[in-house]
UniProtKB/Swiss-Prot annotation:
Family of this protein: Belongs to the mitochondrion-specific ribosomal protein mS33 family.
Pfam family, one: MRP-S33
Region entry Disordered, spans: 84-108
GO cellular component: mitochondrion; ribonucleoprotein complex; ribosome
Protein name as annotated: Small ribosomal subunit protein mS33
KW Mitochondrion (keyword) present: yes
Job description of the protein: Component of the mitochondrial ribosome (mitoribosome), a dedicated translation machinery responsible for the synthesis of mitochondrial genome-encoded proteins, including at least some of the essential transmembrane subunits of the mitochondrial respiratory chain. The mitoribosomes are attached to the mitochondrial inner membrane and translation products are cotranslationally integrated into the membrane.
Coiled-coil intervals, chain numbering: none
Keywords for this protein: Mitochondrion, Ribonucleoprotein, Ribosomal protein
Subcellular location: Mitochondrion
Keyword presence, Nucleotide-binding: no
UniProt organism field: Neurospora crassa (strain ATCC 24698 / 74-OR23-1A / CBS 708.71 / DSM 1257 / FGSC 987)
Quaternary structure and partners: Component of the mitochondrial small ribosomal subunit (mt-SSU). Mature N.crassa 74S mitochondrial ribosomes consist of a small (37S) and a large (54S) subunit. The 37S small subunit contains a 16S ribosomal RNA (16S mt-rRNA) and 32 different proteins. The 54S large subunit contains a 23S rRNA (23S mt-rRNA) and 42 different proteins.
Length: 108
């Protein structure tokens, strides 16, 4: 002996009211499972360490006061690039003009 569908729906509706759940007789996807979960934003924000203040940030911040700050790492980098350029091992110079039609016809 089976119970009519309407009677089962009344039972489910009463159960949902009693236990404070959503009544969804058609089984439509509502996203309640995702919405009930805890927010992940704070956990993701604390995953990466906070950024430390570097020499460049200090130069930007206090450059208007006339304070000079030496960035040894950047100075070493610039010296290294100058040495490479002196031996013709550095990056090529950028072109200053737009490519013309004659440049496109050249064989490579």
């Amino acid at each position: 002996m089976s119970v009519p569908r309407a009677r089962l729906l009344q039972l489910v509706k009463a159960r949902c009211e009693l236990f404070s759940t959503t009544f969804n007789p058609e089984g439509i996807r509502t996203g309640n499972k995702i919405l009930r979960q805890r927010l992940k934003g704070p956990a993701l924000a604390t995953y990466y360490p906070r950024k430390n203040v570097g020499i460049r940030e200090l130069q930007k911040e206090f450059g208007t006061l006339g304070l000079e700050v030496d960035d040894e790492v950047d100075d070493d980098r610039l010296e290294h690039l100058a040495a490479l350029r002196a031996r013709d091992k550095g990056a090529p110079k950028k072109k200053r003009t737009a490519p013309s039609a004659a440049d496109a016809k050249k064989k490579k």
